[in-house]
Amino acid sequence: MICAPTGSGKTTVAKTLLLKRGWVLGFFNKALDETAKDFGPEWERLKDWPRFGIDTRQNRLMLWPATKANVSETIAHHSDVFRRAVDAVHVQGHRTLFFDETHYLTGMCGLGREIEYFHYFGRSNNITCVTNMQRPRWVPKIIMSSVTHAYIGRTFDKDDLRHLSNLGGVDATE
């Protein structure tokens, strides 16, 4: 889990971590994200999920759907593309999944159940999740309770601090 305010280097931290992993699929959504665009030549960018899936030998994939004419169309398009990808990964297994802006994916794109599923059952299917988020209280609880490694940037929001104090299932009052 990587949790920090916007502009604090979450994507840069993720890039460093993901280069240490094999078989990575990143879910990207910000049209003009210069940091993500600079991930490097070893990453293959996909604008859509291939109809017949991907070649399992493809090692580093950035699933980065196009922005549409308006916000509603963009969210609907992203939801469709990302949902087809998570369904395929569920069957294939053996991937590290990077979710950029997890709240956008779980909330606006409606992928909360799918991302929760990977946090509950992914390990037994050789799936690792790396989640980027700006606010810990806006993502499903299972993400916070299944964290094994965390990078946490500065926050002064009391609700966020309370959520972070329970990281890994530890009661903040203990």
Language-model regions, residue ranges each:
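Conserved P-loop NTPase mechanochemical-coupling segment
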Residues: G53-H77
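Structural motif
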Residues: V24-L25, R60-M62, T96
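Conserved P-loop NTPase motor cores
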Residues: M1-L19, S72-A172
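Short, well-ordered alpha-helix to beta-strand connector turns
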Residues: R21-G22, R57-R60, V147-T148
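Short loop/helix-cap segments at secondary-structure boundaries that form the rim of catalytic
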Residues: D33-G40, I54-T56, P140-S145
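Residues at the C-termini of beta-strands that transition into short coil/loop
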Residues: F28, K47, A66-T67, R154
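Walker A/P-loop NTP-binding active-site region of P-loop NTPases
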Residues: S8-W49
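Short glycine/proline-enriched loop/turn "hinge" motifs that connect secondary-structure elements
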Residues: F52-T56, V89-Q92
